[in-house]
């Protein structure tokens, strides 16, 4: 049946949620909103609509997405948000809970529909993830919309008990452990990607913004004593790799220089990207969504934070302070030096070598850190709990 004609009966007794997402940086915003929408529908049996302004980036994460105004995917009512087309007529009235993803500015007509409700909706302004101390103070603070008098609640994802938590499906750790405890899953997955590497090769995933430090990182791997195989989902960083190699890197092709092999793989849907992270020995990730997934993978990682005129380094250091807890001063210094060099586009050779010298300890720490975080209440649960307390 065509997605345009799918009809689903909505139980009016089930709370309705609307999540709005304006795609700013290709995949990060929609990645978070799509995960949140799916989790709310699957784990809490909620009626969820996801409004997205750009379908092309969304389709990269969810290949079954079609080019149409409305469709149902994995229990979520997905709507193409086209400017002010989201009116009371097209949205069947404002929902009980409205999530404004990353201050994306809701359509004026929709806000009017919110104000016209007999019972005001719960209105969340979902912020970006941060480990900065201010998150503890500002999370869940209300503000009043000047035009309508509606209350909007700032919801700040974070790593402490006083923040909004981070996205985590209930079974993600269980699924990860099952995958990593059976080498067959990894072997079959890599075979599907046409990746060939022996057990002595360090497998690295690379999903990054453009970075002038990348050539030095590749050079460090090329000259290292142990072989490295770098798997690169097709995207923005491939051109930089081709410049370093001095030749094109077609999809599926592997090119070897010294101890370094680089292979371009397809851009993966979210579930497959999890499998990539679970399969690799070291993960280089970018933005918010892939960072969180790399954390749940329980493998050593390097994060390329979204650049913001210097402010991102404050955010990066705040996360490093939390992430390196439990490491020795030498181990923490190695992680910090590597991450700072990568995010300031500085020399990478020595930081990479120092980090690899501590890799066994970093592997244990990554695993234990994921376990520690999995014991905390996740973002979707905290949102639902917040709403339940107000009913």
What are these regions, as identified by a protein language model?
Residues 127-215:
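A nucleotide-sugar donor-handling region in carbohydrate enzymes
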